[in-house]
Amino acid sequence: MPKRVLQGVVVSDKNDKTVVVKVERRYSHPLLQKTVRQSKKYKAHDENNQFKVGDLVSIQESAPISKDKRWVVLTNEAAG
């Protein structure tokens, strides 16, 4: 099964080798017929501490790294 890849914004880089990425998804509410925004935060592994708050990044699912970390940062999307 392929690994999931998500895009989000780094909201915290205070932990060593870890960033918190906020991923937002939009969907149409079945009853209200409105577009609803929903967000979720993922802890992702950042080996070199190179990503800072506000960076747009891609994260990929991986094997568990710690109790909460199951994602790895792939690339900085803003850089291209």
From Swiss-Prot:
One of its GO terms (molecular function) is rRNA binding. It comes from the Bacteria. Keywords: Ribonucleoprotein, Ribosomal protein, RNA-binding, rRNA-binding. The keyword Ribosomal protein applies. Pfam families: Ribosomal_S17 (PF00366). One of its GO terms (cellular component) is cytosolic small ribosomal subunit. InterPro entries: NA-bd_OB-fold, Ribosomal_uS17, Ribosomal_uS17_bact/chlr. The keyword Isomerase does not apply. One of its GO terms (biological process) is translation. NCBIfam families: PRK05610.1, uS17_bact. Belongs to the universal ribosomal protein uS17 family. PANTHER family: 40S RIBOSOMAL PROTEIN S11 FAMILY MEMBER, SMALL RIBOSOMAL SUBUNIT PROTEIN US17M. Part of the 30S ribosomal subunit. One of the primary rRNA binding proteins, it binds specifically to the 5'-end of 16S ribosomal RNA. This is Small ribosomal subunit protein uS17. The gene is rpsQ.
